[in-house]
Amino acid sequence: MRLLTQGEQRRRFFHQTRINSAGAGDPNVSFHLIVIPIRSKWEIIPFSRIFAMFESFGFEETTAKEASVLLAALIGLAFGVLAQRTRFCFRRSLVGEDRRQALGVWLTALALAVIGTQAAVAAGWINFDAHRFMASEVPFLAIAIGGLLFGAGMVLTRGCISRLTVLTGGGNLRAALVVLVFAVVAHATLKGVLAPLRVALGSVTVDMGESVSLATLPGGALVWGGLIAVAALAYALRSGNRPGQLVMAALIGLLVPAAWVGTGYILLDEFDPIAMESLSFTSPSADTLFWTIASSSIPAGFGTGLLGGVFVGALVASLIAREFQWQSFDAPRQTGRYLTGAAMMGVGGVLAGGCTLGAGLSGVPTLSVAAIEAIVMIALGGLTMQALLSRSSAANGAGSTTRQVQPAE
């Protein structure tokens, strides 16, 4: 007996459900019902002409993973445009000269991400029970060290990895080199020569049992999610930003639940399961690097589509705004600083379980204790490195009234 290919299984499924939905072949039935599996439950959904259109375009041949690449590209495109216009960056919100406004933008996005994600959970569309954020064995040591490294690295490179990806689309060659080195080091930490370090640090865990989420605390997800969202919005509304900036920041935040729901609900496929993912740059950067050099052997995934979309979106936005400009390094010392920061972020992002987006903007809305620890340690690492740089700059510039100029990112 020959085993059916995935495409044949999908075509047979659609054909059978169409027969079943047409009222057992009754020619008088004009309003079809299609039976599809959603979260392992069979639900009857009205379909009619939409089904015919879906089939006519040959979408029944499209796998869930292929569809996730398109979804990620669209989400990445939107993020690239919005992040370029708002200068969205966690580093700026910590140590930038305009950190009050930058933090207001970041917290607005976080608030909407929390509201949207928890609303999707409450609606039963998604849940994070099996997600790595909710693993009972939490590698606190790896997260702490990784967060500190990533935070320090993003200060050295004057931008978190999401910001640097956006800057790459605007012609910044410094950012492009950092993104490349970051991807190489992240991949080496995941699967290469630095993997033993990751495994060793990751083996030091604390068993949190069921207390891996704020949702398990008194008050539950509604109270804790609400507190985070309200506190974030309260600060954002007093941050001095123009309403337009906050609206764009809110749209960035809504991309997080859009990705969670897209991969965890809309594209849920019993025949072709995919991981539930959202905005993140660490693992996607490593995956994109590997796909770039071996695309004939491995298919693109959500992360590859996301990064491609971000780059294109940032490029288009910078061209429309006439802000595209080629930029490079000014001196070898500056190059060394950026490469060091890139390597630190590559190792740190993997150990921490994500970057400022993966662990922060996407992770915190899940109410995961591990994600919250990661973003707190990233912030601490960034503030510590900035303090060290300021002290060094003050010592080197003693007796001089001229402030050392640094490249504005």
Placement of each model-derived feature along the sequence:
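Intrinsic low-complexity, disordered N-terminal segments enriched in polar/charged/small residues
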Residues: A24-D26
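N-terminal leader/targeting segments
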Residues: E8-R12, N28-S30, E43-I44, R49, ...
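Leucine-biased recognition of intrinsically disordered, low-complexity hydrophobic segments
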Residues: L3-L4, L33
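Short hydrophobic alpha-helical segments enriched in small aliphatic residues
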Residues: Q16, V29, L33-V35
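Basic polycationic patches enriched in arginine
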Residues: R2, R10-R12, R18, R39, ...
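Intrinsic disorder/low-complexity segments enriched in polar/small residues
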Residues: G7-R10, T17, W42-I44, V405-P407
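Intrinsically disordered/low-complexity terminal segments and short unstructured peptides
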Residues: L4, Q16, S400-T401
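Membrane-interfacial helix-loop segments of redox and metal-homeostasis proteins
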Residues: I44-E409
